[in-house]
A protein has these predicted regions:
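Charged, glycine-enriched surface loops/patches
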Residues: 147-169, 187, 191-202
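Catalytic His-Asp segment of secreted/periplasmic serine-dependent ester chemistry enzymes
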Residues: 173-252
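Structural recognition of the beta-strand scaffold that forms the well-ordered cores
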Residues: 74-78, 99-103, 127-132, 165-170, ...
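Carbohydrate-interacting regions of secretory-pathway proteins
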Residues: 151, 198, 251-429
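Oxyanion-hole/transition-state-stabilizing segment in secreted/luminal serine hydrolases
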Residues: 83-100, 109-151, 156, 167, ...
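Solvent-exposed loop/turn segments at secondary-structure junctions
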Residues: 81-85, 105-109, 134-139, 172-176, ...
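N-terminal secretory targeting modules
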Residues: 1-77, 83-88, 92-93, 123, ...
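Acidic/histidine-rich helix-loop elements
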Residues: 41-54, 87, 95-111, 138, ...
Length: 429
């Protein structure tokens, strides 16, 4: 990033490695020089060759080359200055997770493609987290070119290990004043989603909606220069990634030890999908149950350490429902907790009608909740009396008189993003 030149030079001053002699220094620098010409290089679009960027590229990469063995098996974060600025340990945001930061300030998608093998794949990563594309815009690359480079990167990651999880953060909002207008970023993200539609290996996290203001630009309180996040911005990014990393098995690996209140019975045992299944959409006639199975046959619903996870569909949105095999004709109180990734859309079916369960502040419809905790656990309580239900989230009323039929099952919808449910319990009243 041109505007980041001064900071990059400061990084150079403090990060220069100590070589025993000038010959070693020249060899180290030469190994990671940016090719003088684009001829024969993979991908398309800009490769930056400003002197400050070439120096930073060489210093960062020669330093990483000495850490290959130490960083093997890490979750690797690949990106530009936004990633680099998070620090070597990603700000301590993922306790217990071995991480490796491979962000270089100013880098483009093509630059990341060129260095992918040495900087990322040589580490035999357990997973890769991607954030890329904003610098390409400053260099006047088209959204189509940027998305094509992402496609090549994903192909290389899949070729290396088709089972390795890849998490794609959508390009953060910025500003036209930074040569990164909202419409161009939205177009890139649209194309990114199209690229990964059939990629089961890739989980998309909607970090654009997370950060965008009403005009689609970055917010000053999170991006003071309208490009780089401050501590608050990084905290929001970390919170958006943590649920996905938990689903992938890197965080929250211990079972939930919650004990039900007296009179409540668990509808979900925390270990598998016993008591849950698919039903015919119109009649709600049971068509398949998953007793003893950890996941539904399509992998959308998964039991993980006490959490019933509705995973992010590769195609971006896929509407379906998982239902209890039991039905509930009497008055009851249903309690559960949910956690949503940014802009996630799900729902809780009460005998049949759907109570919207979403990342409310972004996805609605209850955008004015004061106690809702984004990307954290929130409690929903549904009290059914006669033909009506009173529904609350963290004690705030969602629906005071929600009409429900005389009997029916409890259901959980999958739509957009990842939604987790836990501590699902019911008391007949």
């Amino acid at each position: 990033m041109k505007s980041f030149q001064a900071a990059a030079l400061a990084i150079l001053a403090c990060c220069l490695p100590a070589f025993p002699n000038s010959t070693a220094q020249e060899a180290g620098a030469g190994q990671f020089q940016i090719p003088a010409s684009d001829d024969g290089l993979p991908g398309a679009g800009p490769i930056r060759r400003y002197p400050w960027f070439q120096n930073l590229w060489q210093i960062k990469r020669s330093g990483w080359a000495k850490r290959v063995e130490a960083d093997k098996g890490a979750v690797v974060f690949l990106g530009d200055s936004i990633t680099q600025g998070w620090g070597d340990e990603m700000g301590g945001s993922f306790p217990g997770v071995k991480v490796a930061n491979r962000g270089i300030s100013g880098d483009t998608t093509r630059g990341m493609l060129i260095r992918l093998q040495e900087d990322v794949l040589s580490l035999q990563p357990e997973a890769v987290v991607l954030l890329m594309g904003t610098n390409d815009l400053e260099e006047k690359a088209s959204p189509e070119t940027i998305a094509a480079n992402l496609k090549l990167i994903l192909a290389e990651l899949s070729k290396h290990d088709p089972e390795m999880p890849v998490v794609l953060s959508l390009v953060f909002p910025s500003s036209a004043s930074k040569s990164r207008p909202a419409e161009a970023i939205k177009k890139i993200n649209q194309l990114y989603r199209e690229v990964v539609k059939a990629e089961k290996q890739v989980t998309v996290v909607d970090t654009w909606t997370l950060f965008a203001n009403g005009d689609g630009d970055a917010k000053k309180e999170e991006f003071p220069d309208l490009l780089h996040p401050n501590a608050e911005g990084y905290a929001l990014w970390a919170a958006a990634l943590r649920p996905v990393l938990a689903t992938l098995g890197f965080l929250e690996t211990e079972p939930d030890d919650f004990q039900n209140e007296e009179g409540f019975v668990s509808l979900f045992n925390g270990e598998d999908l016993t008591g849950w299944g698919f039903r015919e959409k119109k009649s709600l006639k049971p068509i398949k149950n998953f007793d003893g199975e950890q996941a539904s046959d399509d992998g959308r619903y998964v039991a993980i350490n006490g959490r019933l996870v509705v995973t992010t569909p590769p195609e971006g949105r896929r509407i379906q429902q998982l239902w209890t095999t039991a039905e509930f004709p009497t008055d009851f109180t249903l309690k559960l907790e949910f956690r949503a990734t940014p802009n996630a859309d799900s729902g809780i079916f009460i005998r049949r009608p759907q109570l919207q369960c979403r990342d409310y502040l972004l996805a609605g419809p209850y955008k004015n909740l004061e106690r809702y905790k984004p990307q954290d656990w929130n409690e929903v309580v549904v009290e059914v009396r006669g033909g009506q239900a009173r529904c609350t989230c963290n004690g705030e009323v969602l629906e005071a008189e929600f009409k429900v039929p005389a009997t029916g099952p409890i259901g959980l919808e999958g739509d957009r993003g990842q939604m987790e449910y836990r501590r699902i319990r019911l008391r007949e009243d």
